[in-house]
């Protein structure tokens, strides 16, 4: 009996739905817009005015107005609001089976509920009230499943006509009032809007209503414009008709709204897919057609198919909005190396150039979208779609959740790093697609910046997302670097290819984001305008962009809070965010094999027939790391570009035989050879090469930094009282060095060993001077007049002087590990030997690297300290004034002994203390602190104290000694925080020990305080200079900057009464009040000394060959072979 009642109720619902549509055709036929009916009330079609009309129930009494109001309210509410689309989604998903099961669920009290359903029959007033309810909640989706709760059903109590049944229905939590009402009116809604073709009367009316209310965009295929959620699209039986209707509108009104289903390229793509599936061999083979023509696969079409598949793989179809697919396909086409434009003499396919192309290709679609929406902010909407693409790619690249990324631990010995790869590496992508996605994100981030470049980055609407993305990418890079370090330490070198590809792409994208957040895009215009995107992807292709954050993040934090972000979200965002990292150096080391690929050498023949006027002047700029020249397509000059010596300056240390020089450069690109490696007939060559590692003609860069690898000041002069050995023997040096590594040497043996090494270095320096003099002498006289006797005597002397070289000594130290072993037995002798070797031209940086990578010992710390303090060598007496130096020299000449004897009894062969350049000092400290941190970390893992904690007592002593050393350097002004590049390494070293050693804690926070103070001082100085030298443009920009500060202050949460001013918000409020948005960041590293926007022509080797020329050359080659 109950089943029969349920069936009866279901039948009543069906009858009600079918009867609801009886007069709908009449409604459409006699439709009159409300704008005409309410002309006397000056009604203007808009959502706000429509909502006011619905609240005026006196309008419902007029049948003519009521019927037309119902149509307009139904179209606008259901198809252009979020709440209405929630109702439509339920209608679309409610199948016949679901409705039947819903009716059967109310077997009890069925008569009362049936009466409710009957009360809804032909009740337009209730339907209008329901549409009013939806319109009042137009910006929020309906949580339909919760409308069984009384608090949710109460606003819908107007649907219950009988006042007696209201309490029982509202309190019945098993009954969903909203769902029952929607099921009841489903049939009527479907019949009301249905149309058999796009040109039926109902369809035309729908289109007119949407256009009058300017809601065509919101209705378009039921998309959610500003939503990151994967909303399910509503596909009712009439949705395709409405979509087609808008596509066929006059003037192609919807052509710019991007519906891929009606794209003109759809047919070719389907043809490609069908051909690929049915005949896969066509991809790999070429077959003639029946007419004899050759059909070759279309690379462009296959790339289009690849981009379409990526769009689906990224799951962007679930968040599809107008222009989204068009933007994605345009980005793919521009960044894909197979489809992007080819470079020419006027353009470089740079990031900035691709951005301009992107805007040009999207301009027509943007204009069309603006025609349909008066309030359309195309910049924000373009960037909003870009953010959707970035989020989708990061999700696919497994770089979306920071908590998951931060929980991965590759250094855990109990878990192998390979078992953790699935947690942070992408799945189902090859390296080409991975790099393509990162390229897409790079152009997307740059677009977000460029469209809002007129305002400070702190006010960019997508600032929060950019910082979050940078944070995730930094975590991914750290994980990848850990794996590469582990493999290098184990000697296996099996870093997976996907890990290398991930770090390559992530580092490139991170550098763009960091440049944007640091406000350095204009400073780094060279990278964005003069380097191609493919070059930019390499760590060596990016000449200026850093991946680290150097900006004052307090301004970003204050702006986020002022613009509405919650304090909890901002706190989570900036937690675990480490600015000023040095990942870029590790990445360059990881990809060192790419260095020569992006610093390619060139020869004079590369210029071809070009005039000297069109040859790039910077082609004569030497690479900082190689003795080659590389070609740039711009006139930009960097501060570390080496100044090339002119004319005779090169010849002083060069060769008159150009062929020998070119051969030497080819054989050893990393070593810059001295003149004696390739001399003319006037200077005799020898099979033993000199130890020179850097050419002395490239001495200073454009910022004035001294890059010479030579002894300095008085170290160039020999001590008058020092007794050199004319012919030092290699076997004596070899035997004494090996003996000193195992047993204690007596004083005579120690002095003999030191004198032999000093003599080798001195002989090489003399030979270099002789070569210089010989070259100058040969250039000034006629070579025919030279006497053979002088030449032969020079040959004999040179052969004697070159029997033993510093190369031989360094080889013994390195291969036999003799030096490191000697430190355990004869450390005084070993360090004096190091002093003498540091006088060798070209070996100083090599020796600095060598000694900083030795095992950390107390004597090593002492030696580094003495080097920096100027206590090594032979310090002058007194205050080291000019008079003191003269007195010491006169005393030594007259007395034949040094005035200040060394405590070790091992005299120094040169004059004065050992002097290091700023570059050498920075290198010494940076390498020392970094390797000390690595050594101490490994030492702690090997030893445990009595409590079982991994703390080495030996390490405690070393760290305490390092702290004392740094404190002394600071006190003597030998450690400059702003100029030093080793601060990060020192902080990393101290970080582990601040909770163990009080000295480490005091030093760590002292460094942090001094850094903050000096940054503030430098900022104040920059602001003072900026105010002093400000031009008219800066004066004009001063007013908007102050207005921005005032606006942000007004947007801050109001100050609570009776509260102190110590809260973070009040601190940030005070900070932002005086903050200047023109503040510039000064990151370390390379800088542009001269920037020129001119693009130079392509090198001849890089120019594409025309097809007819290629065929001609091919025919000539075939003819020659025959």
UniProtKB/Swiss-Prot annotation:
Residues 1-24 are annotated as: Disordered. The keyword ATP-binding does not apply. The keyword Transcription applies. GO terms for cellular component: CCR4-NOT core complex; cytosol; nucleus. It is found in: Cytoplasm; Nucleus. It comes from the Eukaryota. The modification Phosphoserine is found at residue 1042. Keywords: Activator, Cytoplasm, Nucleus, Phosphoprotein, Repressor, Transcription, Transcription regulation. Residues 11-24 have a biased composition (Polar residues). GO terms for biological process: nuclear-transcribed mRNA poly(A) tail shortening; positive regulation of transcription elongation by RNA polymerase II. Acts as a component of the CCR4-NOT core complex, which in the nucleus seems to be a general transcription factor, and in the cytoplasm the major mRNA deadenylase involved in mRNA turnover. Present with 1320 molecules/cell in log phase SD medium. Subunit of the 1.0 MDa CCR4-NOT core complex that contains CCR4, CAF1, NOT1, NOT2, NOT3, NOT4, NOT5, CAF40 and CAF130. In the complex interacts with NOT1. The core complex probably is part of a less characterized 1.9 MDa CCR4-NOT complex. This is Protein CAF130. It comes from Saccharomyces cerevisiae (strain ATCC 204508 / S288c).
């Amino acid at each position: 009996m109950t089943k029969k009642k349920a069936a009866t109720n279901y039948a009543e619902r069906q009858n009600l739905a079918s009867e609801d549509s009886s007069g709908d055709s009449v409604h459409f036929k006699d439709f009159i817009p409300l704008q005409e009916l309410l002309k006397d009330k000056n009604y203007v079609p808009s959502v706000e005015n429509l909502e006011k009309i619905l609240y005026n129930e006196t309008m419902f009494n007029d049948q003519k107005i009521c019927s037309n109001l119902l149509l307009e309210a139904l179209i606008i509410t259901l198809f252009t609001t979020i709440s209405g689309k929630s109702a439509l989604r339920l209608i679309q998903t409610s199948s016949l089976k679901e409705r039947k099961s819903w009716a059967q669920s109310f077997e009890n009290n069925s008569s009362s509920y049936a009466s409710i359903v009957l009360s809804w029959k032909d009740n337009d007033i209730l339907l209008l009230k329901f549409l009013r309810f939806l319109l009042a909640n137009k910006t929020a989706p309906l949580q339909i499943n919760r409308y069984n709760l009384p608090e949710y059903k109460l606003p819908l109590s107007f649907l219950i006509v009988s006042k007696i049944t209201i309490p029982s229905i509202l309190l019945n939590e098993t009954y969903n009032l909203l769902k029952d009402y929607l099921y009841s009116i489903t049939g009527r809604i479907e019949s009301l809007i249905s149309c058999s073709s796009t040109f039926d009367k109902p369809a035309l009316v729908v289109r007119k209503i949407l256009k009058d209310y300017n809601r065509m965009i919101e209705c378009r295929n039921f998309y959610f414009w500003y939503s990151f959620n994967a909303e399910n699209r509503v596909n009712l039986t009439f949705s395709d008709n409405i979509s087609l209707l808008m596509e066929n509108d006059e003037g192609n009104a919807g052509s710019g709204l991007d519906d891929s289903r009606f794209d003109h390229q759809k047919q070719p793509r389907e043809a490609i897919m069908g051909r690929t599936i049915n005949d896969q061999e066509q991809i790999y083979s070429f077959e003639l057609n029946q007419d004899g023509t050759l059909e070759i696969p279309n690379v462009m079409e296959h790339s289009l198919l690849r981009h379409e598949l990526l769009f689906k793989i990224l799951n962007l179809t679930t968040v599809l909005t107008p222009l989204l697919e068009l933007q994605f396909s345009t980005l793919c086409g521009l960044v894909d190396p197979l489809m992007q434009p080819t470079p020419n003499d006027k353009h470089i396919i740079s990031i900035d150039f691709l951005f301009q192309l992107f805007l040009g290709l999207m301009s027509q679609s943007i204009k069309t979208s603006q025609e349909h929406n008066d309030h359309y902010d195309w910049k924000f909407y373009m960037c909003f779609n870009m953010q959707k693409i970035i989020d989708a790619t990061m999700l696919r690249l497994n770089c979306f959740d920071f908590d998951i990324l931060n929980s991965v631990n590759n250094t855990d010995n109990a878990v192998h790093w390979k078992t953790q790869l699935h947690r942070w590496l992408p799945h189902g992508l090859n390296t080409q697609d991975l790099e393509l996605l990162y390229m897409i994100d790079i152009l997307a981030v740059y677009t977000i910046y460029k469209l809002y470049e007129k305002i400070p980055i702190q006010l960019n609407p997508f600032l929060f997302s950019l910082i979050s993305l940078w944070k995730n990418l930094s975590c991914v890079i750290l994980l990848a670097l850990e794996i590469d370090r582990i493999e290098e330490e184990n000697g296996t070198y099996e870093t997976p290819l996907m890990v290398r590809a991930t770090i390559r792409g992530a580092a490139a994208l991170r550098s763009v984001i960091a440049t944007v957040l640091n406000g350095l895009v204009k400073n780094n215009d060279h990278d964005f305008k003069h380097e191609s995107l493919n070059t930019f992807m390499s760590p060596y292709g990016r000449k200026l962009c850093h991946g680290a954050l150097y900006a004052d993040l307090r301004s970003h934090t204050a702006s986020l809070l002022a613009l509405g972000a919650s304090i909890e979200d901002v706190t989570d965002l900036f937690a675990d965010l480490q600015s000023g990292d040095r990942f870029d150096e590790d990445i360059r080391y990881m990809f060192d094999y790419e260095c020569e690929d992006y610093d390619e050498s060139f020869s004079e023949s590369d210029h071809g027939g070009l005039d000297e006027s069109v040859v790039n002047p910077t082609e004569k700029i030497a690479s900082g790391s190689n003795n080659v020249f590389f070609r740039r397509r711009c006139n930009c000059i960097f501060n570390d570009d080496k100044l090339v010596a002119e004319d005779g300056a090169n010849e002083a240390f060069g060769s008159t035989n150009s062929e020998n020089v070119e051969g030497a450069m080819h054989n050893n690109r990393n070593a810059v050879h001295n003149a004696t490696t390739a001399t003319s007939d006037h200077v005799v060559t020898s099979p033993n090469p000199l130890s020179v590692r850097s050419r002395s003609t490239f001495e200073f860069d454009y910022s004035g930094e001294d890059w010479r690898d030579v002894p300095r000041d008085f170290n160039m002069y020999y001590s008058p009282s020092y007794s050199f050995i004319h012919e030092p023997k290699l076997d004596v040096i070899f035997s004494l060095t090996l003996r000193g590594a195992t047993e204690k040497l007596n004083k005579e043996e120690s002095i003999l060993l030191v004198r032999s090494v000093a003599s080798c270095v001195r002989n090489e320096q003399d030979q270099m001077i002789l070569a210089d003099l010989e070259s100058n002498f040969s250039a000034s006289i006629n070579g025919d007049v030279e006497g053979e006797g002088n030449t032969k005597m020079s040959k004999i002397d040179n052969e004697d002087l070159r029997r033993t070289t510093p190369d031989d000594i360094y080889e013994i130290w390195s291969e036999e590990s003799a030096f490191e072993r000697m430190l355990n037995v004869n450390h005084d002798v070993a360090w004096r030997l190091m002093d003498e070797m540091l006088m060798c031209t070209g070996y100083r940086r090599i020796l600095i690297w060598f000694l900083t990578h030795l095992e950390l010992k107390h004597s090593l710390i002492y030696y580094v300290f003495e080097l920096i303090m100027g206590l090594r060598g032979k310090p002058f007496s007194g205050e080291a004034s000019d008079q003191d130096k003269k007195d010491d020299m006169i005393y030594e000449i007259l007395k034949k002994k040094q005035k200040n004897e060394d405590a070790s009894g091992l005299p120094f062969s040169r004059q004065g203390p050992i002097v290091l350049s700023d570059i050498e000092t920075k290198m010494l400290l940076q390498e020392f602190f970094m390797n000390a941190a690595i050594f101490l970390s490994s030492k702690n893992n090997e030893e445990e104290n009595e409590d079982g904690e991994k703390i080495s007592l030996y390490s405690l002593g070393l760290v305490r000694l390092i702290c004392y050393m740094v404190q002394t350097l600071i006190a003597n002004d030998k450690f400059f925080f702003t100029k030093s590049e080793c601060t990060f390494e020192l902080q990393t070293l101290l970080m582990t020990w601040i909770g163990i050693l009080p000295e480490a804690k005091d030093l760590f926070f002292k460094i942090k305080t001094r850094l903050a103070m000096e940054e503030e001082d430098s900022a104040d100085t920059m602001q003072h200079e900026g105010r002093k030298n400000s031009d008219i443009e800066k004066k004009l920009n001063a007013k908007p900057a102050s207005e921005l500060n005032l606006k942000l202050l007004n947007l801050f949460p109001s100050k609570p009464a009776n509260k102190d001013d110590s809260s973070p918000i009040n601190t940030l409020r005070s900070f932002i009040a005086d903050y200047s948005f023109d503040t510039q960041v000064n990151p370390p590293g390379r800088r542009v000394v001269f920037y020129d926007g001119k693009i130079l022509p392509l090198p001849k080797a890089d120019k594409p060959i025309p097809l007819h020329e290629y065929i001609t050359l091919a025919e000539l080659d075939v003819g020659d072979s025959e």
